[in-house]
Amino acid sequence: MSRLLHAEEWAEVKELGDHHRQPQPHHLPQPPPPPPPQPPATLQAREHPVYPPELSLLDSTDPRAWLAPTLQGICTARAAQYLLHSPELSASEAAAPRDEVDGRGELVRRSSGGASSSKSPGPVKVREQLCKLKGGVVVDELGCSRQRAPSSKQVNGVQKQRRLAANARERRRMHGLNHAFDQLRNVIPSFNNDKKLSKYETLQMAQIYINALSELLQTPSGGEQPPPPPASCKSDHHHLRTAASYEGGAGNATAAGAQQASGGSQRPTPPGSCRTRFSAPASAGGYSVQLDALHFSTFEDSALTAMMAQKNLSPSLPGSILQPVQEENSKTSPRSHRSDGEFSPHSHYSDSDEAS
């Protein structure tokens, strides 16, 4: 009997075990799920119908859930649309929001579909895409738009303008210089009218012409023309003499030479020194005369041409028109020729002039 009861009890226990084994998974204690991330207050107030509850299914460890609070400053609705249509979501999770999104969501899906990859894009790329979709709105806080450096075209334009301005200034300067040389060529005489003088030749001819005019003004009208000075005294020709003294009376050149030889009041001139034509002191019978350009009568062109013809070099040397004739007995200083045809500033002066 006891054995039969034991079998009946075993059957009851077995039935109870089968009965309790089926609902057993429903009664097991389960850990509470982590609280879903709460959407921002601005999102609940403004874009609540566009922000579906599918975002609550995201785990707190999912990096896509971290992007939502980062993007709440620009456009939260677009951030939600980007998260819902990211390639990480499965087809079942993304089916409902695809039906609810509007035309803006379609643009987001088209732009994100071309740039989809195995990894979800970082917050910087998401920020740039959302800023582009907002229609060019500038957000200075997030740095979506940056000030662009001046392009190479603008820099090249500025450099071209400066170069053109410098070229124009140099062109005006050369035109003014050429005009001044043309005016100088018109006033100086030229023996070869067919050939246009160069700038260097024009300056040399102007120097010869000025020296000839100064000698003509310094020559007395009734007296004998004194001999020309040596080349070392050419610096004296550049200054006009305002006063000159000469001896009067009926004395001739022989008497004057005898007076200079016998008289002890005058100091003899050394052979190497520079003698001027009118530097001798006036004698007892002499008197000084103030020379003025207005007191002289106008000279003829033939006299000036003959005077300048005496200053030309021999035809065998090049540039004979430019250089005056040098006396054989005069002491000349060597000229330092340069490669460009110019002379040094002290080429026309001797060492004795520089020392004095």
From Swiss-Prot:
Residue span, bHLH domain: 161-213
Renumbered residue ranges of the record's region Disordered: 1-56, 92-125, 218-279, 314-356
Tagged with keyword Signal: no
GO BP: any one term: sensory organ development
Pfam families on file: HLH
Location of this chain's protein in the cell: Nucleus
GO terms under cellular component: nucleus
Alphabetically ordered keywords of this record: Activator, Developmental protein, Differentiation, DNA-binding, Neurogenesis, Nucleus, Transcription, Transcription regulation
Compositionally skewed regions (Low complexity) per UniProt: 110-124, 252-266
Compositionally biased intervals (Pro residues): 26-40
Single annotated GO MF: DNA-binding transcription activator activity, RNA polymerase II-specific
Compositional bias annotation for Basic and acidic residues: 1-21, 96-109, 337-356
Highest taxon listed in the record's lineage: Eukaryota
Keyword Nucleus included in the entry's annotation: yes
Signal peptide: none
Function: Transcriptional regulator. Activates E box-dependent transcription in collaboration with TCF3/E47, but the activity is completely antagonized by the negative regulator of neurogenesis HES1. Plays a role in the differentiation of subsets of neural cells by activating E box-dependent transcription.
Complex and partners: Efficient DNA binding requires dimerization with another bHLH protein.
Protein name: Transcription factor ATOH1
